[in-house]
């Protein structure tokens, strides 16, 4: 793991802002997300997470769609958001929520010059939009960054490395789900309840200070500890069992 990746993971674990250039991307904690509404929160992330192919396929005019497919190499995802007033409005509302500010505007008239300006000083454009979205996904949406492997395209190697860890965390969650449920996916409330019940320091009162990244990391680690204990017990009857220590990287 590179020093840069370690630094990024430290900030994710600490719940601190991650910077894309001079833009601070601060994760919301569970309490803030609960107050906003988890579904609304996830919808805001999903809106800005569309791929270029998804954007083109969503266009009803087949002639325009065919032309955009032929010229796809000329465009970035940000350009597609800026081509439509309706999509511009959705992007503004998403950034309103995710950056917790009403001061979000579209600046510029020509496509190449258009940008989203937050609080009058933070500029998101076609050059850094992918990086901003990638970091928001890593902080707040492990389901997207870890499970949609074919569609998820991290904007840089640091994000890719952390996304791999999130994928492993998600796999641990899925294994636990397979053992304990009837096949329905674990929900965020399920994970919050499980962590607050298993943890020695977190409870129903203070768990809301965690970010989603911290919650998933805590759940994955607690699950590894539980699995380690089971492996130790099983090794008494079957010495061939390979024991993975709970402190091993997730």
Label for each model-derived stretch:
Residues 1-67, 137-231:
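An amphipathic, hydrophobic-aromatic interaction surface with interspersed Lys/Arg
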Residues 14-16, 21-24, 73, 112-114, ...:
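Generic structural motif recognizing short loop/turn segments at the entrances and edges of beta-strands
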Residues 234-250:
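Long, intrinsically disordered, low-complexity Ser/Thr/Pro-rich regulatory/activation regions
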Residues 38, 42-97, 126-129:
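Phosphate/adenylate-binding glycine loop and adjacent helical scaffold
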Residues 79-181, 185:
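Hydrophobic, aromatic-lined core segments that form the binding pocket/scaffold
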